Amino acid sequence: MAHDVVLIPGDGIGPEITQAMRRVVEATGVQINWNVQEAGAGVMDEFGTPLPQHVLDAVAETKVAIKGPITTPVGTGFRSVNVALRKHFDLYACVRPCLSQPGDGSRFRDVDLVIVRENTEDLYAGFEFDEGAAEVEELSQLVERSGQKTFAADSAISIKPISIAKSRRIVEYAFEYARRCGRKKVTAVHKANIMKATDGLFLRVAREVAANYPDIEFNDKIVDATCMGLVQNPNDFDVLVLPNLY
């Protein structure tokens, strides 16, 4: 039986990569009906958006999509198609296995860890205001009323939402993944020493969730120390769960 799959080739190196992917899939003998849909800068003139509604409808219908890289303008222009897809379909868990391969040239052997990253909130949520916007002035006044020293008048602002519900959802996902896949430890990665309200909330929820999984070891690490640990001894890690920014 053939499977219906949406293919979004993307732009730049995207079409080349997705063509190679199709050859690999064809070599397996699995029958795929490719529903090719275009998104990105190449469709802006025609549809006025990098992610037309008919692309979203196609993905919703098949429930499976493979996407090549899509250009995101730096500092200006349309927002990331990747982020838009994640938010539209509530694709809250970005799961990245990291596994040593023969001949990879790394000085580390037998690396086998999984990064579980929250995909829908934090600074990547896209709540931003340009310098000079009325919202920036309103936020400045709000900060002043709270008794804190406000920011410079010519600032641009990004808002960092971290919620209890979405923190719990991603941490529970990480623990359930660990349990299902025979993993032994979950590490919550954060910057709660500085961002006490937001990352502090994430860490507090992670600790609460961890108490429900006594069969899985839990610890937490500041993101700076995590990065150092990953390059010094990646074998110390198993499953890492972290907010969207990291």
Language-model regions, residue ranges each:
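N-terminal beta-loop-helix "entrance" segment that forms/cooperates
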Residues: 31-53, 228-230
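Glycine-rich phosphate/diphosphate-binding loop of Rossmann-like nucleotide-binding domains
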Residues: 6-27, 137-224
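Extreme N-terminal starter segment of soluble prokaryotic enzymes
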Residues: 1-5
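Buried hydrophobic positions in well-ordered alpha/beta secondary-structure cores of metabolic enzymes
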Residues: 11-14, 63, 116, 174, ...
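Short, small-residue-enriched loops and turns at beta-alpha junctions
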Residues: 43-45, 73-74, 193-197, 228-229
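Solvent-exposed alpha-helices and their adjacent loops that cap or buttress functional pockets
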Residues: 6, 57-59, 105-109, 149, ...
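N-terminal glycine-rich phosphate/adenylate-binding segment common to multiple enzyme folds
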Residues: 45-145, 156-158, 245
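Glycine-rich phosphate-binding loop
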Residues: 58-73, 210, 215-246
